[in-house]
């Protein structure tokens, strides 16, 4: 049988089951929509109001993007060989449709939703179900569809039928769509148990504050975005508060003090300043205030700030984008001075790699799955430096300790998939 398939919701026999409300990870809160179904929200209500307010650059877009389930997932353990997820998808947001129209115009990728439900088993990708296949016909009713996943392939057992309850226990992660919202019912299986994964206090928490690239445009699967890849491969507990079209909006952080404190915060904003006119002075104040608020919220979290690449992107007349690298750098420097003076972990600023045209799905710089993989590898290497480097804490500057010198790689190295010369050769001696 196929690893994943779709069928209409029905009253088929339940062997083991759990409500999605018990299994959701990566959401700020859950909205009860009746009959024990829930809608996961990535943002607290105060944040949602701020995203749709006059303080936002593109409130109409943000109101559409906030309900999307980027980074939200169901995590559980089961001995079932087949699972069924009850899900009702939201309609595709108009803002998403406009981006996908640009993808179709470029022609590198085939037309479609470019989003999916994705399943990991024991930390490895199992299957994706494109949303084009999940969206139910009207006659299926308000409860939407059932998506069935097989966890035990017949070929692995000599094409013999796997009896219910005889499969090995597995840890399963179901990634919800990145580019639209959803309502969730039960997860059912044919095994003897299906239970939530116990929270492990030793697992580091990762919070990503980014734009459409970090949200998951347009890499075809929610499990293929760079935040999802980094979280899966490093075993991090991810909350992804990335929003298509977002910039440094300080008011969007209001209410985040209720979130469980992250161990690592990645800020990946700035590229969208290329689309609008803005004063350098105003944007400088907003970027400084934003990063200062992040620092105040989580003073002990490792902070990675990703600056958009300097080249390869045109901007409208009057845009501050040509200066955004310096604007972000100056704001990071203020946070760094404060952290170093207090003996806390320092902030790390890096420039994102510039992807080639063959790695971009459209003219707006959204990566393909291959491009997202390169970004994930780049971020992963930077986290090695950030989490292992002591010179950032002691000196506020990268390049002093063996940990960072041993793992440093340039953006060009990341794109080429190989290391260049010894990075120590390019670091100036400041003794």
Role assignments for model-derived ranges:
Residues 61-63, 242-246:
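Short, flexible loop segments at the rims of nucleotide/cofactor-binding pockets, characterized by
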Residues 85, 239-242, 305:
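A structural signal for short, well-ordered beta-strand segments and their strand-loop junctions
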Residues 248-250:
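Active-site-proximal loop/helix segments of hydrolase catalytic cores
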Residues 174-244, 253-261, 391:
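Serine-esterase "nucleophile elbow" of acetyl-processing enzymes
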Residues 67, 71, 77, 252-405, ...:
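Alpha-helical cap/lid subdomain in secreted, periplasmic
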Residues 17-19, 29, 45, 221-229, ...:
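Secondary-structure junction/capping motif
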Residues 156-166, 182, 217-230, 255-269, ...:
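Short, charge-rich amphipathic segments
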Residues 1-205, 382-431:
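N-terminal secretory targeting modules
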């Amino acid at each position: 049988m196929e690893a994943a398939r779709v069928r209409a919701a029905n009253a088929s026999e339940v062997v083991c089951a759990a409500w999605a409300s018990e299994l959701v990870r990566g959401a700020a809160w859950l909205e009860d929509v009746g009959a024990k179904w829930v809608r996961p929200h990535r943002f607290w209500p105060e944040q949602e109001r701020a995203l749709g307010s006059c303080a936002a650059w593109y409130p109409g877009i943000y109101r559409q993007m906030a309900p999307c389930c980027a980074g939200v997932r169901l995590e559980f353990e089961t001995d079932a060989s087949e699972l069924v997820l009850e899900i009702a998808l939201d309609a595709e947001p108009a803002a998403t449709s406009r981006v996908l129209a640009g993808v179709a115009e470029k022609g590198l990728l085939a037309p479609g939703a470019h989003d999916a439900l994705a399943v990991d088993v024991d930390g490895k990708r199992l299957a994706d179900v494109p949303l084009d296949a999940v969206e139910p016909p009207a006659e299926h009713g308000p409860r939407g569809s059932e998506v069935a996943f097989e966890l035990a392939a017949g070929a692995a057992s000599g094409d013999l039928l796997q009896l219910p309850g005889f499969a090995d226990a597995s840890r399963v992660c179901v990634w919800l769509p990145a580019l639209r919202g959803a309502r969730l019912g039960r997860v059912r299986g044919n095994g003897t148990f299906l239970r939530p994964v116990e929270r492990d206090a030793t697992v580091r928490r990762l919070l990503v504050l980014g734009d459409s690239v970090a949200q998951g445009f347009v890499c075809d699967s929610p499990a293929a975005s760079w935040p999802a890849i980094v979280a899966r491969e490093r075993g991090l507990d991810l909350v992804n508060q990335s929003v298509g079209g977002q910039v440094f909006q300080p008011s969007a952080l209001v209410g985040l003090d209720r979130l469980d404190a992250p161990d690592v915060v990645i800020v990946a904003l700035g590229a969208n300043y290329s689309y609008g006119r803005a004063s350098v002075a105003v944007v400088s104040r907003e970027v400084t205030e934003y990063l200062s608020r992040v620092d105040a919220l989580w003073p002990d979290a490792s902070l990675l700030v990703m600056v958009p690449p300097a080249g390869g992107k045109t901007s409208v007349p009057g845009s501050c984008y040509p200066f955004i690298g310096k604007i972000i750098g100056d704001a990071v420097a203020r946070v760094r001075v404060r952290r170093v003076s207090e003996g806390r972990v320092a902030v790390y600023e890096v420039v994102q790699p510039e992807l080639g045209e063959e790695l971009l799905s459209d003219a707006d710089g959204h990566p393909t799955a291959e491009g997202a993989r390169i970004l994930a590898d780049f971020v992963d290497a930077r986290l090695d430096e950030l989490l292992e480097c002591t010179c950032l804490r002691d000196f506020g500057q990268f390049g002093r300790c063996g940990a960072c010198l041993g793992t440093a790689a340039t953006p060009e190295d990341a794109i080429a998939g190989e290391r260049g010369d010894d990075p120590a050769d390019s670091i100036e001696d400041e003794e």
